[in-house]
Amino acid sequence: PIIVASMFGNTTECVGTAKQVLEKCGYEVLVFHSTGTGGRCMESLIESGMVAGVLDITATEWADELVGGVLAAGPHRHEAAGKAGVPTIIVPGCLDMVNFGEPDTVPAKFAERSFYNHNPQVTLMRTNPEECRELGRILAGKINDYTAPVTVLLPLKALSVISAAGNSFHDVDADQALFDAIRMHLRKEIKVVEMDAEINDSAFARLCAKSLQDLM
């Protein structure tokens, strides 16, 4: 059986660990990078009917869609599995960042924001609490439409490598705004599991893998 997973550089450890666990259980895991194109490709593979489970760990494309970054996947991300009835785990991974190109390509209106230079061609901008509230509302709205078995997992300590404590995108208020909005807008019957961990902690990655197996 084929499982698809969404990954970013900042969620590599989480996806890698979950992938190992699932492969040991006999699944084939195909990883898609959440670059806009990657998210759309994953959605279309799910629509094709070849996928048995979805490990949607990286939701970052919504931040680009909302704020105007360069890696948006369009307005239909997180729809295919719900419509196709495919069991899904959803994590709001990397909703702490918007992707831009070289620093001089970042719109002037964001000049006062917090940035991280991932490499000379990639500039990341920290989402603020207001944006995170809206992202939580958008993601919850997509999940509310699922007819498939779905569980939402929240890593309360960090949504990426660089938002962990001591790192440049650590922002408790922004993360809390996101988590609160997801909880507030989700239908009550949708299961939400919280873990006091960072997204790349092996315990959280194993929780992702086990939770998907439980749904399948």
Predicted stretch roles:
Residues P1-V91, F100-E102, R113, L124-M216:
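Metallocofactor- and cofactor-centric catalytic cores in central/energy metabolism, strongly enriched
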Residues D96-M97:
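Long amphipathic alpha-helical segments with strong coiled-coil/leucine-zipper propensity
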Residues V106-T123:
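A solvent-exposed, charged loop/short amphipathic helix patch at secondary-structure junctions
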